[in-house]
């Protein structure tokens, strides 16, 4: 470690988060009960206001910015410890304030505590972790663990719908960063994510020739048949051994069963583990040619999130996190996952990224979404120790 995170300091960090747990959970509850589905402008701004007001109270915080996002609400950027001695880059904390749960979900599934768990729409992904990020900055100041690197917390408001306005902010801050820590939920068992697949979304349209299916089918050129052949070609690109999945999840076409269909389309989800595969697969999909020369095809879309690869830099960052966890008397695991996050954008800029650092729980995007209360202090102390050790 560059700075020793001793057992004594680890114990103090745990004590801090345990002592603050009630106040932190009050903030989490306020966030959960302020619904903020992607695109809910009022909800987004209200959530950001709660977090901004809390951040402004913390020693070490030098600026709190509410950044307008057209059609989505507001992003939040908090800068802290800007007088830190190390000039090689910031420690960037990334999260998001939007959820997949539409307004009204809270009425159906209100805040509920049961058996050491707290349930509520968006609590696991990831409103509890937004609150945790602010508490970690508070802990660094309160425990006199001012980090060597300035800290930037960036919470975007459109991650769940593809980061249309947040991506540029993430990339701009990542270019200034020494390390990026993503507070997305962990994998089962609290494992952090050292690799994430990249994603691509495509649509293939086929424009054929309509004809009567009984009287003169030979005059028709079936758009549905063309799409079916394209689907077989796409399916052949799957390679589980390399982490490549190509899924045609939606197909539309035709008008009536007795008409050779003139129009059809398919929607494609692409997942890949390396940037090299991303380029090849994107070119192969966009370069599709019709099997029937009478049919015209058009392909739209492309890669929208690069992969987070487990590079040597990522492995080194994970090893540091493991050392901090050991001082907290637990073993930190790692895994690779198929879903993407805003951390993928940072990883594409060759910055070390450690993802899945949020509070353990389950049920992201589901009706049983919850966090595990006993993991709050441990996760907060882990993040505090990791930032202090960089």
Please place each PLM-identified region on the residue numbering.
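Short, conserved micro-motifs enriched in small and acidic residues
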Residues: 118-131, 160, 221-224, 370-377
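Short beta-strand segments
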Residues: 94-95, 154-156, 181-184, 205-207, ...
């Amino acid at each position: 470690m560059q700075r020793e995170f001793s057992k004594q300091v680890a114990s103090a960090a745990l004590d801090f988060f345990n002592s603050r747990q009630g106040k932190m959970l009050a903030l989490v509850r306020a966030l959960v009960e302020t619904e903020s589905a992607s695109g809910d402008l009022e909800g987004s701004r209200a959530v950001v206001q709660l977090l901004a007001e809390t951040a402004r109270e913390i020693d070490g915080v030098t600026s709190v910015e509410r950044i307008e996002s057209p059609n989505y609400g507001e992003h939040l950027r908090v800068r802290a410890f800007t007088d830190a001695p190390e000039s090689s880059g910031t420690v960037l904390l990334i999260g998001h304030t939007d959820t997949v749960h539409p307004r009204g979900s809270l009425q159906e599934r209100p805040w509920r505590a049961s058996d050491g768990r707290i349930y509520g729409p968006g609590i696991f992904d990831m409103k509890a972790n937004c609150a945790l990020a602010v508490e970690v900055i508070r802990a660094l100041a309160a425990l006199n663990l001012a980090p060597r690197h300035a800290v930037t917390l960036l919470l975007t408001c459109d991650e769940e719908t593809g980061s249309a306005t947040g991506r540029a902010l993430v990339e701009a801050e990542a270019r200034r960063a020494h390390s990026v820590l993503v507070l997305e939920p962990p994998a089962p068992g609290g494992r952090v994510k050292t690799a994430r697949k990249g994603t691509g979304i495509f649509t293939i349209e086929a424009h054929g020739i309509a004809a009567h299916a009984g009287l003169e089918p030979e005059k028709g050129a079936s758009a549905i048949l063309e799409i079916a052949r394209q689907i077989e070609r796409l399916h052949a690109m799957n390679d589980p051994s390399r982490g490549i999945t190509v899924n045609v999840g939606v197909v539309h076409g035709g008008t009536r069963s007795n008409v050779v269909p003139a129009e059809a389309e398919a929607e494609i989800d692409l997942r890949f583990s390396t940037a090299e595969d991303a380029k090849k697969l994107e070119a192969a999909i966009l370069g599709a040619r019709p099997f029937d020369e009478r049919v015209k095809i058009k392909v739209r879309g492309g890669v929208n999130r690069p992969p987070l690869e487990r590079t040597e830099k990522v492995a080194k960052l994970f090893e540091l996190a493991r050392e901090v966890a050991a001082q907290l008397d637990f073993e930190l695991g790692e895994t690779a996952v198929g879903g993407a996050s805003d951390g993928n954008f940072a990883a594409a800029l060759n910055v070390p990224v450690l993802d899945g650092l949020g509070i353990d729980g389950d049920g992201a995007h589901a009706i049983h979404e919850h966090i595990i209360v006993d993991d709050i202090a441990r996760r907060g102390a882990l993040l505090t120790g990791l930032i202090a050790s960089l």
